Amino acid sequence: MRQPGRFVSRLYYAWGVNARAVCYGAMLAVCAGPALAQSAPPNPLLTSPLPHIQPAPQPQLGAGLPNFETPGAEGTLPNAAIAVRSVTVVGATAFAPARLAVLTRGLAGQTVALQRIEAARLALLGLYRGHGFILTTVSLDIDAAGNVRFIVIEGRIVAVKLSQSIGPAGTMVLRFLNHLTAERPLNEASLERWLLLAQQIPGIAVHAVLQADSDDPGALTLVAEVSKQDVSGLLTADNRGFKDAGPVEALAVADLNSMTAQGDQTEVSLFHTEVGTDNFGQVSESFFIGDRGLRLKLYGGAGRANPRGTLGAVHYESFITVFGGVLSYPLLLQRNQALDLSLHFDGIEDTIHIAGIRNSADSLRVARFAGQYAWQDLWAGNGREAQSVLNLQDSQGVPAFGASPDGRTAPPAGRADAKMDFWKLTGSVSRTQTLFSPFGAATVALRAEAGGQYTTDILPSEEQFYLGGSRFTRGYYSGQVVGDKAAYATAELQLNTGDEFTLFHQDIALGAQFYGFYDWGETWSNLKTDLNHQVRSAGGGVRLGLTKNLEMDGEVVERLTTQLEPKVTGTAPLSETVIYWGVTARY
């Protein structure tokens, strides 16, 4: 099933989340003083900006999988009847004889119309197909004496080959696909799982072709048409940052793909703002463990922020170090649905200096358990495809392995009364639903998303929920409004258009997504001295796909909430209208 629309809402606008939010919060603290209750967003670069910067990979459900026809009658049968002497089913191993006999009952010893015998054949075939045995065939043989034989050929894969050598990475492809040779008959769910897993090997593209063996009915050879991209990359920039740390910001990512037989990926990420006020770098290494799909990612990074403006005047600097690991496993991986589970352990070391003196320090150790379920459906009818994604993450602060103790004073915590052994639950659900086609290949779709965070604890600044960015509550930089608890909702109406053609022997794919949106978000603080906020915005824009590797975006937003701080603080309201741009190039 094709994903609704040519584009999806980008997650990578919302970068530099912490880098910007921190500047804002510290500015309030410096300028307003302790007498006024403030909503103090985190200081710059309190945690890695990368989760808020990089485009989140969209579930590629069913990509590259072979399609199988629905079984039907093989031709028009003559209007005749025969005297059936006996009925046998030959070659069936997947089901007990008693189960098969139910489908052929009433044929033997009777004069039966050919259409009824054909119906029994289709019932046998339907039994196999209904259980996912899509490579199985059932044929019919009737001899002159009236003996009826249903010949079942249970399709199976006996060998897997690669179309070309791709170095050590080919070993990982074969480890996955060779699982298919152990099943007889072959189940569609298994075929889809192992093919989709092979496609998740970094830098590897896989397309399956099945070849029949003329000497062995039912025996198939799977030829994996493979290609490999050793190096891939991403460069993206926009103007959504906080003014004293941007607002122009950029991210460069370089990947070295599958250089060993473990399907590894080495990734280097560099985040940089307009005049170098915020800089962050991270290196990660990921690889498969075994041949079932379990994957481990290890990472480490560091950054520094020294914003301009009021914070620059007091010589504000923040330093961050992050490290950790992620174990992920695809529990369910099929053509139209996928369920991924992951276990995370994150370490964050954050220090803030003002005028060269250490002002606060936090050391966090956090265990997280996360799940993502994605599915495609046709609930609205044929031609109205939809894709939905549900995300849940449970996080628990770990008061060990070097974590800061609660209630410390030297140096103090970055947020008063914050609990290092906190608990929180974060989640979101989104759906992009195709509505209709107004003309040609164009489609109109509705994208809706809702989500938020719940906790009963006063969270460290690094773990508060950030509103703003490019995916929801647009018009505010990511982290401009934060809270221990939060909720948001967004609705976006999209007009998707596109055209593909060849120019100078190059395939060109042009596309445009015009959209209008309305966003709402609200935060609640468990710290009584912090403010709660509600923000709303509306606007529209266009996402232009100039080639398959280059996208340019423009957006106009009307802020419906402009006064984020009490007027008594003297904080000026935000401007009502703001214009954003973005560009992304992939290699």
PLM-predicted stretches and their roles:
Residues 351-520, 524, 567-569:
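C-terminal outer-membrane beta-barrel translocator/porin domains of Gram-negative envelope proteins
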Residues 254, 544, 556, 573-587:
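Outer-membrane beta-barrel "beta-signal"
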Residues 218, 246-250, 277-281, 319-323, ...:
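Residues that define the transmembrane beta-barrel architecture of outer-membrane proteins
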Residues 2, 38-241, 253, 271-272, ...:
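Periplasmic polypeptide-binding modules associated with outer-membrane biogenesis and secretion
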Residues 233-235, 264-268, 294-298, 339-343, ...:
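Transmembrane beta-strands of outer-membrane beta-barrel proteins
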Residues 231-241, 252, 263-274, 281-283, ...:
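Transmembrane beta-strand segments that form the barrel wall of outer-membrane beta-barrel proteins
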Residues 225-227, 238, 255-257, 284-288, ...:
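Transmembrane beta-barrel domains of outer membrane proteins
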Residues 206, 231-233, 260-266, 291-297, ...:
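Repeated loop/turn-to-beta-strand initiation elements of outer-membrane beta-barrel proteins
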